[in-house]
Regions:
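Catalytic cores of eukaryotic secretory-pathway lumenal/extracellular enzymes that build
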Residues: 1-149
């Protein structure tokens, strides 16, 4: 599954400065690479990670140029606990922010979109022993990111 593949991906990293992780169904905007770099610089944090749950396909056009939600950013705020005790994020994102001038410190991390310096992959690697714990992936990695800088 994706968690095992993600845990192995860091083994093929060369000397890349930035790493990005996206879901397979992700669409990219024009100049996405420069936009991501510019937003990351606004974090003013060497260990900053840009991450968010992308808009679902039905509302994706609302967030593009000319869309009614162009200045909105979905924001993951709440964590719920599943019957098995695993923490999981409510989907779709349960909050939003409007007219940001720079990224906000988040309450979580999304495996659907993540952009950071590649040292993240070394200091907070995927736990390849949690390959069957899909809901646990995001929260456990977020907690380890938080405690490691």
């Amino acid at each position: 599954g994706p968690m095992l593949a993600r845990s192995l991906a860091r083994k093929v990293l060369g000397n890349e400065e930035f790493c990005m992780q996206v879901d397979a169904h992700t669409d990219f905007a024009n100049n996405w690479d420069q936009i991501a770099l510019d937003e990351w610089k606004k974090t003013e944090n060497e260990f900053g990670v840009l991450s968010n749950v992308p808009a679902d396909k039905a509302t994706k056009s609302d967030y593009t140029e000319g869309g009614e939600k162009l200045t909105e950013v979905p924001r993951q705020c709440a964590v719920r606990f599943l019957d098995n005790g695993f923490p999981d994020y409510i989907k779709p994102a349960d909050g939003k922010v409007v007219d940001l001038t720079k990224p906000l410190l988040g309450h979580g991390w999304s495996a659907s979109f993540s952009f950071a310096k590649c040292h993240l992959e070394e200091s907070v690697p995927y736990d390849n022993f949690s390959i069957y714990a899909m809901p646990l992936e995001q929260f456990s990695r977020f907690a380890r990111m938080w405690t490691r800088g």
